[in-house]
Amino acid sequence: KKYGGWDNRKLVGFFERYCKVLFERYKDQVKYWMTFNEINNTLKLPYLAAGMVVADDANAPQRQYQAAHNMFVANALAVKSCHEMIPGAKIGCMLSLSTAYPNTCRPEDVMETYQLRQRSLFFSDVMLRGRYPSYIDRKWEELGVQVQMEPGDFELIAQNTNDYLAFSYYMTSTHIAGMKIRSNTGGHIGADNPYLEKSKWGWPIDPVGLRFVCNELYDRYQKPMFIAENGLGTADTIDSDGRIRDTARMEYLKKHIEALQQAVADGCDIFGYTWWGPIDIVSAGTGEMEKRYGFIYVDKDNQGNGTLRRRKKDSFEYYKKVIASNGQDLELPAED
């Protein structure tokens, strides 16, 4: 209420001070750092990504892009402090980078889908390349955006780029030129893709898309990559014997790790993978408990009723095996 979110430049100084406290306190224990989570959601989910309540009006882009610039400056200051205070540490940025395919080979579909992708990659372009991309000038002119910058901002951003790129990947979408752009926490909600299966909540399941994104990003930035979020939100059933046979979740995990192995074979530098998430929580995308991601079941329903008792799903032991083998043993358990 007092500062209004990241469109207020004062937050840059607050963030720098906060980072320095963390670097000093944990410099002997932590060598990998990440500045912002899914920072590119500032343009589609500003409250979640940038702490801003933004009215859906003509002034929204001005506030959102101003917030983005302030976050770029804050990120660069964090990178600078991290490298000075913790020699050898790596500090990265994190984006939501589920991608979109053109619905057809119609040139308008292809061009508009490309521009939609630029909208997401704008953030990593600045934070990893150290400069504003040329395509943003036209976008700002069309939107009437005039970002306020201070002397030295460009130099600071150019001299303090991130060491690695982390990103979340859940699905792909399909875009038709002229369609209204809608988004959720997983990415762009587009047209139907008849070649892909979908989750109960309509999210396309596309492991090949993960391989595609890894190659796209590594070609663009040549920086190490970390898949910080990947997972399947679905309903779970407790069988009469007390087991939760979440086969669909295990199949999703297996196919996406296989896609990562293919990306590594393609030459991509991928140093980490984490699943969203280990335990059932309320879904950020829909506000439901029923939409479960975890390997651990929590007894709670959409109305908040339940004992909160926890129990392992079949996927718990499966992922434990996958971790122990560093992804080499992906054989699914036999059905009984």
Q: For the regions a protein language model found, what residue spans apply to each?
A:
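Active-site region of glycoside hydrolase catalytic domains
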Residues: 1-336
